[in-house]
Structure formats: C-alpha cells, structure tokens
Amino acid sequence: MNFNATLIGQTVAFIIFVWFCMKFVWPPLMNAIEARQKRIADGLADADRAVKDLELAQAKATDQLKEAKVTANEIIEQANKRKAQIVEEAKTEADAERAKIIAQGKAEIEAERNRVKEDLRKQVATLAIMGAEKILERSIDPAAHSDIVNKLVAEI
C-alpha cells in the first residue's frame, strides 16, 4: 500500500471539510432541529391542553344545560301554579258575580211581583167597588146578585 501525497492531501482536505462542517454547518442544523422539536413538543402540549379545555367546556356546557332545564321546569311549574290560581280566582269571581246577578234578579222579580200584586189589589178593589155599585143600583134581587158576582169572578 502506497501512501502518496494524494492520499495525504485527501485526508487533510477531508479533515478540513469535517472541521468546517462541525464549525459552520452543524450548529445551524442542530438549532433548526431543536427548534422544530420544540415547536412539535409545544404543539402537542397545546393540543393536550385544548383537549382538556374542550372536555372542561363540554362538562360546563352540560352542567349549564342541566341547570337551564331545572330552571325552565321551575318556571313552568310556577306558571302552572299561577295559572291554576288565576283560574281559581276567576271561578270565585264568576261565582260571586253569578250570585250577585241571581240575587239582583230575584230582587227585581220580587219587586215586580209586589208591584203586580199591588196593581191586582187595586184592580180587585176597583172591581169590588164597581160590583158593589152595580148591586146597589139594581134592586135587591138574589138572581141579579148572583149574576153580578159571577161576572166579577169571570173578570178576576
């Protein structure tokens, strides 16, 4: 094996090339690789945080939805109670108004009946007076009396 100057020159050139690469090429490559590794690690950490945040947000949304349903049910229940109360109040007021109208109607009927009775008494009294006048005008005849009384009864 022959060691000639070419082999030594190539070895020296290779050593200079390796030194040059280690000094000027290798550090920027390592920095780029480390930066990429850091970005990937940060991205994975952010993804994990995002997943956890999403789970928390979903749990919170579920809780809020449950609370909203409970609140809605309470509001509906209160509305139904209020509706029943209003209906009951309306029934009570309607019953009171009905009783008032019935009492007023009965009072009006009673007043009208009393007025009619009074008018009837006046008419009966007038007829009795007219009958007595007719009886007195005629002679005192039992047949005539009976006839006049029958006419009065028919008029009444």
From Swiss-Prot:
GO CC annotation terms, alphabetical: plasma membrane; proton-transporting ATP synthase complex
Transmembrane segments: 7-27
Record GO terms (molecular function): proton-transporting ATP synthase activity, rotational mechanism
Pfam families: ATP-synt_B (PF00430)
Cellular compartments annotated: Cell inner membrane
Broad class of the protein's primary localization: membrane
Record keywords, A-Z: ATP synthesis, Cell inner membrane, Cell membrane, CF(0), Hydrogen ion transport, Ion transport, Membrane, Transmembrane, Transmembrane helix, Transport
InterPro entries: ATP_synth_B-like_membr_sf, ATP_synth_b/b'su_bac/chlpt, ATP_synth_F0_bsu_bac, ATP_synthase_B_chain
Membrane topology: Single-pass membrane protein
HAMAP family: ATP_synth_b_bprime
Function per UniProt: F(1)F(0) ATP synthase produces ATP from ADP in the presence of a proton or sodium gradient. F-type ATPases consist of two structural domains, F(1) containing the extramembraneous catalytic core and F(0) containing the membrane proton channel, linked together by a central stalk and a peripheral stalk. During catalysis, ATP synthesis in the catalytic domain of F(1) is coupled via a rotary mechanism of the central stalk subunits to proton translocation. Component of the F(0) channel, it forms part of the peripheral stalk, linking F(1) to F(0).
Family matches, as PANTHER family: ATP SYNTHASE SUBUNIT B, ATP SYNTHASE SUBUNIT B', CHLOROPLASTIC
Record text on subunit structure and interactions: F-type ATPases have 2 components, F(1) - the catalytic core - and F(0) - the membrane proton channel. F(1) has five subunits: alpha(3), beta(3), gamma(1), delta(1), epsilon(1). F(0) has three main subunits: a(1), b(2) and c(10-14). The alpha and beta chains form an alternating ring which encloses part of the gamma chain. F(1) is attached to F(0) by a central stalk formed by the gamma and epsilon chains, while a peripheral stalk is formed by the delta and b chains.
Family, similarity comment: Belongs to the ATPase B chain family.
Name this polypeptide is given: ATP synthase subunit b
Organism: Shewanella oneidensis (strain ATCC 700550 / JCM 31522 / CIP 106686 / LMG 19005 / NCIMB 14063 / MR-1)
Gene behind the chain: atpF
